């Protein structure tokens, strides 16, 4: 069943500045800035009305409705990110060979994972801050997608293949995700 008019209004907090050019939304806040392009969403109009972001579409079928509410969620995540920020925690786990992790430029270098001589590298995306504290890695930033992808890059760079995972539990694993308060 198609819905004739679908409209959603998202409240903009006082300490957030929203800039809209076509389908590109730039949101600035105390924690940083997030830019996202929604040009893929055909038939969905995004506009500013005072201190609200207004999204509208007409004759929304099931697929268009799914895209519409995905965009609403993305914009809400962007506003939360620039006002509070996102943080992921990862744990370095090793049994015999002490794994060392350090941040060099825009990459995380993992050395001595299960005694390997080569260095594994994971890319840090733009706008994301990574810190290593003992056996914990903290990934934080205003863009949820960039923070989550950086944490996933670190986790997948430390993935071990060719070993029984029940015995060789070495690696780096995400154990906590949170919104910074």
Swiss-Prot record:
MF GO annotations? rRNA binding; structural constituent of ribosome
Question: Signal peptide: which range, if any?
Answer: none
Please report a single Pfam family linked to this protein: Ribosomal_L6
Is the Transcription regulation keyword given for this protein? Answer: no
**Keyword annotations for this protein?**
Ribonucleoprotein, Ribosomal protein, RNA-binding, rRNA-binding
Database matches in InterPro entries: Ribosomal_uL6-like, Ribosomal_uL6-like_a/b-dom_sf, Ribosomal_uL6_a/b-dom, Ribosomal_uL6_arc, Ribosomal_uL6_CS2
- Similarity annotation: Belongs to the universal ribosomal protein uL6 family.
PANTHER family according to UniProt = 60S RIBOSOMAL PROTEIN L9 (PTHR11655:SF16), 60S/50S RIBOSOMAL PROTEIN L6/L9 (PTHR11655)
Stored NCBIfam families: PRK05518.1, uL6_arch
HAMAP family the UniProt entry points to: Ribosomal_uL6_A
Instruction: Describe its assembly.
Output: Part of the 50S ribosomal subunit.
Primary role:
This protein binds to the 23S rRNA, and is important in its secondary structure. It is located near the subunit interface in the base of the L7/L12 stalk, and near the tRNA binding site of the peptidyltransferase center.
* Stated name of the protein: Large ribosomal subunit protein uL6
Q: Which organism is it from?
A: Saccharolobus solfataricus (strain ATCC 35092 / DSM 1617 / JCM 11322 / P2)
* Upper taxonomic lineage: Archaea, Thermoproteota, Thermoprotei, Sulfolobales, Sulfolobaceae
């Amino acid at each position: 069943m198609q819905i004739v008019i679908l409209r959603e209004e998202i409240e903009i907090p006082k300490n957030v500045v929203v800039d809209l050019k076509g389908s590109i939304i730039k949101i600035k806040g105390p924690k940083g800035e997030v830019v996202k392009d929604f040009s893929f969403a055909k038939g969905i109009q995004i506009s500013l009305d005072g201190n609200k972001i207004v999204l509208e579409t007409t004759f929304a079928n099931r697929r268009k409705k799914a895209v519409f509410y995905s965009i609403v969620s993305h914009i809400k995540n962007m506003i939360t990110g620039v006002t509070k920020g996102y943080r992921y925690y990862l744990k370095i786990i090793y049994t015999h060979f002490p794994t060392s992790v350090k941040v060099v430029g825009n990459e995380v270098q993992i050395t001595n994972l299960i005694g390997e001589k080569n260095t594994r590298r994971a890319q840090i995306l733009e706008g994301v801050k990574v810190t290593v504290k003992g056996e914990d890695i903290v990934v934080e930033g205003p863009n949820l997608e960039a923070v989550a992808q950086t944490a996933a890059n670190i986790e997948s760079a430390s993935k071990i293949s060719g070993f029984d995972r029940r015995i060789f539990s070495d690696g780096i694993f995400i154990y906590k995700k949170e919104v910074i308060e």
